[in-house]
């Protein structure tokens, strides 16, 4: 049990591109912050998106196609885990902070549909 009560959850994605309908998740992060700003819990993912990661995207987040294939987990597994993690944080009553929420949450919705990860219902942002 954390010593600091959780206050909010944070979420971020790095992807293969900018089109929310076609880009794929490469990395994801969910953190839980305490009321004092401390990190209470965190979880991160590296996915093999199943497609080539363009050089421009790799230059931004540092993950190449080769690394994703060698070290990443299957995209369908990663997407299901992200959706489950966000649902859990929402069930905890935590508001979600997302730097570029329209992009990240819409892309996750498309990925959830693509990988049959159940309906993704974004939590309060």
Regions flagged by a language model, labelled:
Residues 125:
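Class I SAM-dependent methyltransferase SAM-binding "motif I" and its flanking Rossmann-like core
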């Amino acid at each position: 049990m954390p010593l600091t009560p959780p206050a909010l959850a944070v979420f971020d994605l790095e992807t293969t591109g900018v089109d929310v309908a076609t880009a794929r998740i490469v990395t994801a992060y969910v953190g839980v912050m305490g009321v004092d700003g401390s990190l209470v819990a965190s979880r991160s993912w590296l996915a093999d998106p199943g497609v080539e990661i363009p050089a421009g995207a790799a230059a931004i987040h540092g993950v190449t196609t080769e690394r994703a294939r060698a070290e990443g987990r299957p995209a369908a597994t990663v997407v299901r885990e992200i959706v489950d993690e966000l649902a859990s944080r929402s069930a905890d009553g935590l508001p979600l902070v997302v730097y570029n929420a329209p992009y990240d949450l819409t892309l996750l919705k498309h990925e959830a549909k693509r990988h049959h990860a159940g309906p993704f219902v974004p939590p309060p942002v």
